[in-house]
Amino acid sequence: MNNEEQKLIENLFSRLYKAESDFPNRDKNAEQLINDLLRKQPSSSYYMTQTILVQEMIIEKLNAKILELEKNLSMNEKQTKHGSFGFLSGLFKSKKKEIDACNQGNKAGNHKDDISKRPIMDCLNNNVGKTTSVLGRETIYNTSNNSMSGFLSGSLQTAAGVAGGMVMANLLMNLFQHKRPEEEMIDQISHNPTPVSADSDDLVNNNMNNDKHDVASSDYINDEHEYGEHVKNDHQLHDSPLCSDVSDSTSNNNYDESLNFSNDNNNSSFNDFDDDNFI
C-alpha cells in the first residue's frame, strides 16, 4: 500500500465516522446481522472498501458524462433553433456526421488495444458487439497481474464481482476506457488533495473547546462556592457571641465618648455664659 492508497482509505473512513456521528439512529436488526456476518467473514470489510472506492469513481465518471451529454444537447438545440431548416439541410448534416465517424474509425484502427475506440471500428465493419463481448475476462481478471501492486490493484475486479457478472465487467471496462481505476483515483488525489484529517481535527478542536468550557465553568463554580462560603463565614462571625460582645463594647465606648463630648460642649457653653453675665 502506498501513500495515495492510504489517503483514500483514511478519507473514506473519516467520512464514515462523520456519517456515524451525524446519523446515529440505526436499524438494530440490520446492524446485528451485519456484525454477525462480519464476524463470520472478517475480510469482507477489505473488499467492501475496495468496492466503495471504485463505485464512487464510477459515479463521478457517469456524472461527468451526463453533464457532457446535457451540454452537447443544449448546444445542438441552440444550433437547431438558430440554424436553417431547408429541405436538404438535414441530409448534409447527417452526411457530415457519417464522414466524421469514419475518420475517427480510421484513426482508431491504428491502435488495436484502444478499447475506447473499438465500438467505432465495429460500426464500420458491421461487427457491432463482437469486441465488447470478449471484454472483461481477459482484462478485468488480469488486473492483479499488472505492474501496480497494492490495495487498489484488484479493486475493479472486486467491484465487478460484487456487481455481478461479465456484463457489468464489460460496462466497467468501457467506462474506464481500458485505464485501471486505481490510476484515475490516484490522479484524482494528486489533482484534488482532500484533507483526510479534517474531521479528526474538528473533533480534537471540539474536545479542546469542551475542555476549556468545562475548566472555565468549574473555575466559575469554585469561585462562586468560595465566595458563598466567605459570606457565610462572615455572617457566622457576626452572629457569634464574641463578635456581639465586641460590637456591644464598641457601641458602649462610642456612646460614652459621645456623652463626654456633649458634656464638654455644655460646660464650655456654661462658662461662656457666666463670663458674659459677669462682665
Curated annotation (Swiss-Prot):
Segments of skewed composition (Low complexity): 260-271
InterPro entries: DUF2076
Comp. bias (Polar residues): 246-259
Region described as Disordered: spans on this chain: 233-279
Pfam family membership, one: DUF2076
Superkingdom assignment: Bacteria
Name of the featured protein: Uncharacterized protein bbp_170
Organism: Buchnera aphidicola subsp. Baizongia pistaciae (strain Bp)
Native organism taxonomy: Bacteria, Pseudomonadati, Pseudomonadota, Gammaproteobacteria, Enterobacterales
